[in-house]
């Protein structure tokens, strides 16, 4: 069985550019394949923090007496309109012939969170690498793939983005319902 490395970009257009440079030119359902690579994509945030009523059905109705809403254990959920692409990514990540997963989402906090949310919800245990590029020029892409870093080097960015998301959620849910 041939071995593959899976690359996940933030959006289809970026995935197509990356795939062209690394030789993954065969179109499949939700990804491209070739030259030992599979390249797929998120469509922005495929997953996000669960709505308040996911934590307790009583939060479906807005009541002042229920404030503040402070989840003890945060839940990430896949958006209903994004389930198909998530399922494709989950299947690809956990395929037995995939040896590692490369996060090629945008270089920054949100790109890190977009990828990590999918990686974690898919319960992927494969080694994770990070493609960090600031240009879509072919030479920059080749250089980026030649210098992949361990995904764990970017844990701080994921943590920062997740803290921002939780803070937005807390302020948004509680302040909106308060006023």
PLM-predicted stretches and their roles:
Residues 1-179:
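Intrinsically disordered, low-complexity regulatory segments
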């Amino acid at each position: 069985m041939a071995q593959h490395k899976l690359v996940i970009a933030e959006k289809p257009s970026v995935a197509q550019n990356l795939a062209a440079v690394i030789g993954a030119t065969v179109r499949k359902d939700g990804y491209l394949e070739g030259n030992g690579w599979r390249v797929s994509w998120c469509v922005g945030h495929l997953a996000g923090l669960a709505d308040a009523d996911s934590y307790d059905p009583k939060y479906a109705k807005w009541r002042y007496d229920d404030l503040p809403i402070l989840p003890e254990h945060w839940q990430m959920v896949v958006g209903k309109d994004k389930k198909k692409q998530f399922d494709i990514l989950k299947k690809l990540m956990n395929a037995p012939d995939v040896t590692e997963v490369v996060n090629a989402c945008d270089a920054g906090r949100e790109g890190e969170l977009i990828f990590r949310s999918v990686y974690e919800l898919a319960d992927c245990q494969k080694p994770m690498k990070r493609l960090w590029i600031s240009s879509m020029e072919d030479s920059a892409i080749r250089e980026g793939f030649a210098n992949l870093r361990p995904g764990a080097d970017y844990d701080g960015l994921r943590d920062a983005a997740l803290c921002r998301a939780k803070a937005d959620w807390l302020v948004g849910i509680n302040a909106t319902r308060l006023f």
